[in-house]
């Protein structure tokens, strides 16, 4: 299990949430007041960590949502070829291949150490811009 639960009212901008089983960073939260026929609702707008897709959901404020547990790790770049990067984890020495993001392609060189995030069975290189 790489997620935990939290109520909608506990969420804040900048934190993470699972929407359609995709980890997303919250960019906007608006809470409505309780009305005559229902409880307060929270509207969450978030952007996918791995696909940069904008997602929006509406839940009652007492609704439990899934929060992904994101592991932040470091890896050494072994090689860069054909839009793929071969990495070796700095702690476990496990080697794995990730697709190369065109935005960071010119910044990644063999031998350098890069941070990457791992959650829900997915990994992504997270270089600082």
Curated annotation (Swiss-Prot):
Q: Which residues carry this modification: Hypusine?
A: 36
SUPFAM superfamilies (alphabetical): Nucleic acid-binding proteins, Translation proteins SH3-like domain
Keywords for the protein's UniProt record, in alphabetical order = Cytoplasm, Hypusine, Initiation factor, Protein biosynthesis
- List the subcellular locations: Cytoplasm
| Segments crossing the lipid bilayer | none
Would I find Cell inner membrane among this entry's keywords? Answer: no
Q: Does the keyword DNA damage apply?
A: no
Q: Which Pfam families match?
A: eIF-5a (PF01287), IF5A-like_N (PF21485)
Any one of the GO BP annotations: positive regulation of translational elongation
Q: Please tell me one Gene Ontology term that the record gives under cellular component.
A: cytoplasm
GO molecular function ontology, one term from the record: ribosome binding
Q: Which NCBIfam families match?
A: eIF_5A (TIGR00037), PRK03999.1 (NF003076)
Function text: Functions by promoting the formation of the first peptide bond.
- Protein family according to the UniProt entry: Belongs to the eIF-5A family.
What's the name of the protein? Translation initiation factor 5A
Q: Which organism is it from?
A: Thermoplasma acidophilum (strain ATCC 25905 / DSM 1728 / JCM 9062 / NBRC 15155 / AMRC-C165)
């Amino acid at each position: 299990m790489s997620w935990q639960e939290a109520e909608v009212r506990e969420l804040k901008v900048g934190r993470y949430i699972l929407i359609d089983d995709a980890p997303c960073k919250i960019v906007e939260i608006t809470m409505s007041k309780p009305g005559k026929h229902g409880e307060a609702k929270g509207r969450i707008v978030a952007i996918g960590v791995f696909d940069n897709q904008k997602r929006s959901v509406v839940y009652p404020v007492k609704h439990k949502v899934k929060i992904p547990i994101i592991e932040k790790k470091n890896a050494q770049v072994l090689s860069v070829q054909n839009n793929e990067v071969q990495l070796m984890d700095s702690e476990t020495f496990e080697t794995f291949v990730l697709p190369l993001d065109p935005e960071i392609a010119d910044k990644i060189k063999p031998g350098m150490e890069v941070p990457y995030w791992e959650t829900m069975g997915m990994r992504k290189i997270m270089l600082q811009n």
